[in-house]
C-alpha cells in the first residue's frame, strides 16, 4: 500500500472533479488563449477564492493521450499503469472485460479494391451515423460469434467507432496484446496485417486475421463501411480501485465511451443518462448526489474543437460551461476541482505537452492569487506547477480525508 492509502479516512465529505477535456491552450487571437478570450464571469468570481496552478499530465514535454491524462487526474501514475485504447473503448461500451480477453478499438472504413487489394480511401467511413453503425455491427455480430473456440464480442460505438473483444478460453499471458495496429494512418495505403511480437501474441493475431477476413466478406457490399481498421490491442491491467486506494465511493458522468471505460477501470460507477449536454450532466449529477462522495464529470467538446483548430468553438464551450457553473456550486461540494486532462491548443489541432490550468475550491485554500481562470493567471497561484498524479491527494486533503503522517 502507498502512504496515501494508509492515511485515508472517511468523513462524508463530497469531492467534485470537473474535467474540460483539452482545456489548456496557446495564444490564438490578439495574443490570447481560448480561456483568455472567453467571457467567464462565474469562473472569474470563483477563482478569486480558490487555489490555482497548473499540472503536468504525464511528465515535462510529454504529450499525453486521453487515457494517461485522466489516469493522472484520478491519482494513478500513468507511466506505471498503462492502459490500452481497446480496453477503454470496450469498458465504455458496457463490455465486462475479463483477464481472458483481448480488446481492440475498431473504425469502420471505406476501401477500394485495386488489383484485388483493399486500399483505404476514408479511414472513418464518412463518419457514418451511429444508427447505421448499430445496423452494421448487429449484422457482423450475428455472423461472427466465435473463431476457433474464441468468443467474439462486437459492440457499436458512436459514429464510425466500435469495440471488439476476443474472449479466449483461458487466462492470457502478459504481452499477449503485443499486436500492431492495422490502421495505416493515411489514405491511399493498404491496411496493415496484424502480427504478434511474441509467440503468445501471434496466437491472438492468428484469430484476429481470421476475424478481419470474415468481417471483410460480410461488409463487402456496404456502400461506405466496407472494412474495419483495428487500433489499440490491449489486455485488462491489474489496477486497484479508487475505493481501495482513496476510500471514496466514486461515480462518473460522461458522454463518450472511452471516459466511461477509464472511470470503470478504476472502480467508478458509470451513471447512464439520456442526452449529451452540460445541462443533461448536471441533471444526472443532482439525481445521484446523495449516493456517492466523489464525482467525475467529463465535458468533451473543448477538446473536439481544439482538435478541429476551431478556437471560436472552444471558446463557446468554455463560456457555456461558465454559464452552467452556478448549478454545480448550488450542490455545495466540500471540494471542487476544475481542470483538463491535457492541453489541446487550437493552433496545434491536437493534444500538446503544455501544463493544464487547475482550480481547487474549498474552505481551506489561500486564494486571492488569480484574477481569472486562465493559463497565465494560474501561473500566479499557490499550487504552482504540479504533477497531475498529486491532484487527488490534494482533493482528499482539502476534504479533510487524510490523517496526519507520523507522530
Swiss-Prot record:
EC number(s): the record gives 5.4.2.12
Keywords, comma-separated and alphabetical = Glycolysis, Isomerase
Keyword Isomerase applies: yes
Q: Which Gene3D superfamilies match?
A: Alkaline Phosphatase, subunit A
Which terms under GO biological process does the entry name? glycolytic process
Q: InterPro entries of this UniProt entry?
A: Alkaline_phosphatase_core_sf, ApgAM_prokaryotes, Metalloenzyme, Pglycerate_mutase_ApgM
Catalytic activity, reaction form: (2R)-2-phosphoglycerate = (2R)-3-phosphoglycerate
Q: Which domain of life is it from?
A: Bacteria
What single Pfam family name could you report for this chain, choosing any that match? Metalloenzyme
Pathway(s) where this gene product acts: Carbohydrate degradation; glycolysis; pyruvate from D-glyceraldehyde 3-phosphate: step 3/5
Q: Disordered: where is this region?
A: 175-200
Q: Tell me its family.
A: Belongs to the BPG-independent phosphoglycerate mutase family. A-PGAM subfamily.
Instruction: Keyword check for Phosphoprotein, yes or no.
Output: no
Species the sequence originates in: Aquifex aeolicus (strain VF5)
Name of the featured protein: Probable 2,3-bisphosphoglycerate-independent phosphoglycerate mutase
Database matches in SUPFAM superfamilies: Alkaline phosphatase-like (SSF53649)
Q: Which GO terms describe its molecular function?
A: metal ion binding; phosphoglycerate mutase activity
Function according to Swiss-Prot or TrEMBL: Catalyzes the interconversion of 2-phosphoglycerate and 3-phosphoglycerate.
